[in-house]
Swiss-Prot record:
Annotated function: Inhibits calcineurin-dependent transcriptional responses by binding to the catalytic domain of calcineurin A. Could play a role during central nervous system development.
Gene Ontology cellular component list: cytoplasm; nucleus
SUPFAM superfamilies, sorted: RNA-binding domain, RBD
Low complexity bias: start-end ranges: 8-19
Gene Ontology molecular function, alphabetical: calcium-dependent protein serine/threonine phosphatase regulator activity; nucleic acid binding
Name of the protein described by the UniProt record: Calcipressin-3
An annotated GO BP: calcium-mediated signaling
InterPro entries: Calcipressin, Nucleotide-bd_a/b_plait_sf, RBD_domain_sf
Region (Disordered): 1-25, 204-225
Family to which the UniProt record says this protein belongs: Belongs to the RCAN family.
Source organism (scientific name): Gallus gallus
Length: 249
C-alpha cells in the first residue's frame, strides 16, 4: 500500500513538473509560432556595433588589430571596421542585423587582451518617411481660416472686384465753371420766378479774427545781472599796484 502511495505521489509530481515546464516555454516562446517569429524579428535592430574601451594595442599593433577583427569575421565575412583611436572605440558594420545581434550576445563583456570588451548597438538610422510620421502633423488647410490673422483664405473664398466709384459729373462741371470774383447763375429766372445767382466774396470773419487776436511778438529774454560778489571781485582785479607800494583802483 505504501509502495502504491509513493508511486502515485511521484506521478503527480512529474505531471506537475511537466506542466510547469510547458507554461514556462509558453511564456518564453509564446503560445504559437507567430508570436515566436514576432519575438525573433530583428529587422528593427541596427546593423552596426560600437566596441568601447578597446585595448590600445588594437590601434597600434597590426597583429592585435587582425586578432580583433577575426572575432567578428566569424559572424559576417563582409564586416567592416572604423577605428577611433582618440576615443578608444571601434565601429563594426555588419551586412545584416542578425549577425550584429549574434556578435553582441556572444562577445559582450568577453576578455580581450586583459580587458572586457563592451559592445553596444549603434543608433538606428530612421528613414525620412518614418521620421515624418513620428512628428505631429499640422492641421488640415480646410480649418486654417480660423486662425487670426488668417494664414490662408477659407474654402470657397473668391476675391471680389471693387465697385466703381460714384462721381457726380454735374457737380464737377459746375465747380469747373466757377472762377475767382465771378458770379454763377444756379437757376435761370422765368417770368414768375427770379434767378438764383452766387457771388463769390471775401470772408469777413478772417479779418475780424486778425483784429481780435493779433500775432504775439516773441520778446527777447533779458540777460540776468551778475550778483554783487562777482562785481566786487572784478573791481578788485582792476586795481593796480605801483612801485611805491600804493594801490590805484
Amino acid at each position: 500500500m505504501l509502495r502504491d502511495t509513493m508511486k502515485s505521489w511521484s506521478d503527480s509530481q512529474s505531471d506537475l513538473y511537466s506542466s510547469d515546464q510547458e507554461e514556462e516555454e509558453q511564456m518564453i516562446f509564446g503560445e504559437n509560432e507567430d508570436d515566436f517569429e514576432e519575438m525573433m524579428d530583428l529587422s528593427d535592430l541596427p546593423t552596426s556595433l560600437f566596441a568601447c574601451s578597446v585595448h590600445e594595442a588594437v590601434f597600434e599593433v597590426q597583429e592585435e588589430k587582425e586578432r580583433f577583427e577575426a572575432l567578428f569575421t566569424v559572424y559576417d565575412n563582409q564586416v567592416t571596421f572604423q577605428l577611433f583611436k582618440s576615443f578608444r572605440r571601434v565601429r563594426i558594420n555588419f551586412s545584416n542585423p542578425e549577425a550584429a545581434a549574434r556578435a553582441r550576445i556572444e562577445l559582450h563583456e568577453t576578455d580581450f587582451s586583459g580587458k572586457k570588451l563592451k559592445l553596444y548597438f549603434a543608433q538606428v538610422q530612421v528613414s525620412s518617411e518614418v521620421g515624418d510620421k513620428s512628428y505631429l502633423l499640422p492641421p488640415q488647410p480646410v480649418k486654417q481660416f480660423l486662425i487670426s490673422p488668417p494664414a490662408s483664405p477659407p474654402v470657397g473664398w473668391k476675391q471680389s472686384e471693387d465697385a466703381t466709384p460714384l462721381i457726380n459729373y454735374d457737380l464737377l462741371c459746375a465747380v469747373s465753371k466757377l472762377g475767382p470774383g465771378e458770379k454763377y447763375e444756379l437757376h435761370a429766372g422765368t417770368e414768375s420766378t427770379p434767378s438764383v445767382v452766387v457771388h463769390v466774396c471775401e470772408s469777413e470773419t478772417e479779418e475780424e479774427e486778425e483784429i481780435k487776436n493779433p500775432k504775439q511778438k516773441i520778446m527777447q529774454t533779458r540777460r540776468p545781472e551778475p550778483p554783487a560778489t562777482i562785481l566786487n571781485e572784478s573791481k578788485a582785479f582792476d586795481c593796480t599796484l605801483e612801485v611805491g607800494g600804493t594801490i590805484h583802483c
